[in-house]
Amino acid sequence: MKVAVLGAGAWGTALAGHLAARHDTLLWARDAALIAGLQARHENSRYLEGIALPDALRYDADLDAALAHGAADDALCVIGAPVAGLRTLLRAMRDARCVPAHVVWVCKGFEADTHLLPHQVIAAELPEQRSNGVLSGPSFAREVGLGLPVALTVASASAACRERTLAAFHHGAMRIYTGDDVVGVEVGGAVKNVLAIATGIADGLGLGLNARAALITRGLAEMSRLGVALGGRAETFTGLTGLGDLILTATGDLSRNRTVGLQLASGRSLADILGALGHVAEGVRCAQAVLALAHAHAIEMPITEAVCGVLFDGVAPRDAVSGLLRRDARAE
């Protein structure tokens, strides 16, 4: 199978490496210098340092060539760009006049200014593209790059997209499950990043494992309430793309969002943290969108509100925790 991966960040690179073990895979990035480095060293030293990529993996900075590679009905196009760059990439795809038959995206979050989920952005920019879906689940790019076991879910209304994605990814140490709850999968992937900042703050303040468990559990309730209000199914949030991804991101040391919380608890400013991180922390980007949607649907999301207070309103991390503890008692 021919597979084009658009976006050579950590996640796009790791997935391309996995795909190249079985398929004719082309990894695209608009940065010609990055592509030249990949071609010379078969390593993404900028985003996935120290992990050798398969010799069979090919690289290109020409979007037209990448789209042509993944356009056919028996091929697949994987969008690896983050949510912040998704609309720009989709418009470039539209302008190229080469819309792939099957598209799957792996970004997580809400578009910051519109509060739209990725599938809504894709519907707006590529309305003629109907065989598409989201691939998500508890996964760190570095572990996938190392070939360690991982389980993901592809969700799509299109049976053809589910089958094509399954055929591409389900091999080696990667197990793929299928479903059709695109909204639920996307909401889980977005909200868990905000909640991971909360658990990072709690851990950074030394509040203990009891507090971590409480935040994860009550955070899952927040995720589910918002997801159902937006059209997702409640059972999705107890699966890989809800609870599974939340546990990993809230507790794993490779989690950028958890790192943001830990550093905030230590007293560092958000600007300093993001500058040193060098990678996207989607929880910071989409926290305000999550809270705005909660308010629009009259949904209580106190943990999310506390995180936004720390990130954007100057609330001290310890004061944010105290505010959560002062909330009135209620039935679970």
UniProtKB/Swiss-Prot annotation:
Gene Ontology annotations for the cellular component aspect, listed alphabetically: cytosol
Documented EC number(s): 1.1.1.94
Catalytic activity field: sn-glycerol 3-phosphate + NAD(+) = dihydroxyacetone phosphate + NADH + H(+); sn-glycerol 3-phosphate + NADP(+) = dihydroxyacetone phosphate + NADPH + H(+)
Disulphides: none
PROSITE patterns in UniProt: NAD_G3PDH (PS00957)
Enzyme class: oxidoreductase
Sites where the protein binds NADPH: W11, R30, K108, A141, R256, V280, E282
Positions that bind sn-glycerol 3-phosphate: K108, G137, S139, K192, D245, S255, R256, N257
Pfam family, one: NAD_Gly3P_dh_C
Recorded GO MF terms: glycerol-3-phosphate dehydrogenase [NAD(P)+] activity; NAD binding
GO biological-process terms attached to the record: carbohydrate metabolic process; glycerol-3-phosphate biosynthetic process; glycerol-3-phosphate catabolic process; glycerophospholipid metabolic process; phospholipid biosynthetic process
Alphabetized InterPro entries for the sequence: 6-PGluconate_DH-like_C_sf, 6PGD_dom2, G3P_DH_NAD-dep, G3P_DH_NAD-dep_C, G3P_DH_NAD-dep_N, NAD(P)-bd_dom_sf
Subcellular location: Cytoplasm
Gene3D superfamilies: N-(1-d-carboxylethyl)-l-norvaline Dehydrogenase, domain 2 (1.10.1040.10), NAD(P)-binding Rossmann-like Domain (3.40.50.720)
Highest taxon, organism lineage: Bacteria
Keywords: Cytoplasm, Lipid biosynthesis, Lipid metabolism, NAD, NADP, Nucleotide-binding, Oxidoreductase, Phospholipid biosynthesis, Phospholipid metabolism
Main location: cytoplasm
Active site (catalytic residues): K192
Pathway the protein contributes to: Membrane lipid metabolism; glycerophospholipid metabolism
Biological function: Catalyzes the reduction of the glycolytic intermediate dihydroxyacetone phosphate (DHAP) to sn-glycerol 3-phosphate (G3P), the key precursor for phospholipid synthesis.
NCBIfam families: PRK00094.1-2, PRK00094.1-4
Family: Belongs to the NAD-dependent glycerol-3-phosphate dehydrogenase family.
The protein's name: Glycerol-3-phosphate dehydrogenase [NAD(P)+]
Organism annotation: Burkholderia vietnamiensis (strain G4 / LMG 22486) (Burkholderia cepacia (strain R1808))
Taxonomic lineage: Bacteria, Pseudomonadati, Pseudomonadota, Betaproteobacteria, Burkholderiales
